[in-house]
Amino acid sequence: MDFQVVIFILCYFIGSIPFGFILSYVTGIGDIRKTGSGNIGATNVFRKNKKLALLTLLLDALKSFICVAIAQKYNIDNTILFLAALFAIIGHMFPVYLFFKGGKGVAPLLGSLIFIDYKVALCFLTFWIICFLLCKYASLSSIVSTLIALLFICTYYTIVQSVIFAITALLIITQHTDNIIRMLNKSENKINLKL
């Protein structure tokens, strides 16, 4: 088996680690999938424990950061880094440990961008914050910032790398389909940041 394939499989399994689910159980919240949106990501954890949501966000970002770091250690081609990030994000969205029902991939995307290009990551985070302050929708902020990151990647990176990132962005936006429908119906919940 090609060693790069081994790396991608490893990235998938690392990406599959459901930190939101694990932390919720360990801290006594219970199965986070049975509350709110049913998602295991930081936004849904936020509805139960705001400080725990921050830890979930950091760990979900860290796992993809680690995946990309592993890929770089064994291959200097930046394209491999984009693929490693993609597989980590797929793992997060469709975790083998939770019967392939996971998060939406936003935190892992941020983590991988921090490693690949911190400038794009900074733009991603900046636009997320600005959008969120304006609308209070985490879902819309995630979609907008993902598209902004895609614009930067398409501008400064190769066609192949841009295509890989476009696939990643499409997956993330697709994971937000229910949120998009709720926003169109004006039934999407806004996030209250008060601690």
From Swiss-Prot:
SMART domains: G3P_acyltransf
Listed transmembrane segments: 3-23, 52-72, 80-100, 113-133, 147-167
Its membrane topology: Multi-pass membrane protein
UniProt entry keywords in alphabetical sequence: Cell inner membrane, Cell membrane, Lipid biosynthesis, Lipid metabolism, Membrane, Phospholipid biosynthesis, Phospholipid metabolism, Transferase, Transmembrane, Transmembrane helix
GO MF term set: acyl-phosphate glycerol-3-phosphate acyltransferase activity
InterPro entries given in the database record: G3P_acylTferase_PlsY
EC number: 2.3.1.275
Top-level taxonomic group: Bacteria
Location relative to the cell: Cell inner membrane
Major location (coarse): membrane
Pfam families assigned: G3P_acyltransf
Keyword Transmembrane: yes
Catalyzed reactions per annotation: an acyl phosphate + sn-glycerol 3-phosphate = a 1-acyl-sn-glycero-3-phosphate + phosphate
UniProt pathway annotation: Lipid metabolism; phospholipid metabolism
Recorded GO CC terms: plasma membrane
GO terms classed as biological process: phospholipid biosynthetic process
NCBIfam families: glycerol-3-phosphate 1-O-acyltransferase PlsY
Alphabetical list of HAMAP family matching this protein: PlsY
Family as reported in the entry's similarity comment: Belongs to the PlsY family.
Function: Catalyzes the transfer of an acyl group from acyl-phosphate (acyl-PO(4)) to glycerol-3-phosphate (G3P) to form lysophosphatidic acid (LPA). This enzyme utilizes acyl-phosphate as fatty acyl donor, but not acyl-CoA or acyl-ACP.
Protein name, entry field: Glycerol-3-phosphate acyltransferase
